[in-house]
Amino acid sequence: MMNGLLVIFMAALIFSGAMLANNYIRESADRKRVASDLNLFQNPSMVTNPGEDPYKEVEFPAGILEQLKPFYARNPELVGFITIDGIKDFGYPIVQTDNNDKYYRKNLDLKYSKEGTAFVDYKVDLNAPNQNILIHGHNNKNGLMFGPLEKYNALMYGLDLYKKAPVIKFYGINDVREFKIVGFVVANVKWEDGPTFDFAVTDLSDPAVFNNFKTEVEARTVVNTGYSLEYGDTVMTLHSCCYYFKNVRFLVIARALRPGEDPNVDTNLAKIEFDAVMPDTYVDIYDIGTRAGAYFGNPS
């Protein structure tokens, strides 16, 4: 009997060790790929040998940015590249398809990756005005993809990250746009944790829809950055998981620079909102913030 239990224990130990080793190998490969992609984005001429055209078989969109060519050549579902200066090694290719699940566990080369690929929600029309450009990315608690964004939660980490990294830069196929961050939101997706926020709305052309979105962001943001949303803004929302409790998300909401606006950000305007509207469950666990149920009212 004891010998049988020992065999089972050893088999389980070996299996667990193999799984850990496999996860380590895959994560290491993902880290190398992320570093390689960022390096390639910053140095697109790396792929070019004198006298050679590495893209002679590729049909690029007219006016495509030079930095995007290496990535579009690998995958024509590419729609851009995102960077945030001030967050170490934060730079990722962005794709968009009509299927939000396609890149959940696939990298840009369509190979398995636990990190997946960051993608623009299928509902977004990147060529239309008044859009909320909703970008989904994983947070696997290993510092890759959108994991570092959670450090923007000033209720837990203070304002350090925001002061270093107040701007999102999006390299679209034909242009580069800067987005000033206006808020950070902890959002539950289940009503059992408090009233929810429809952050996934992408068409803000209806003033009533826009005003509701703006009201929610202003009530829920954990930081008043001193910058706000106005009707007609192009909005960007970075969306990822977080682990404060089950089924909760962390959002970074930003808006594009307006015509003639000073691109510089005065981070001294930023203030932590200790009374920010938070999911009820978050307040129950961490004893900070205003319960969303009390602020918005619970459904009957």
Predicted region positions:
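N-terminal Sec-pathway targeting helices
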Residues: 1-9
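Solvent-exposed, non-transmembrane regions of membrane-associated and secreted proteins
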Residues: 13-300
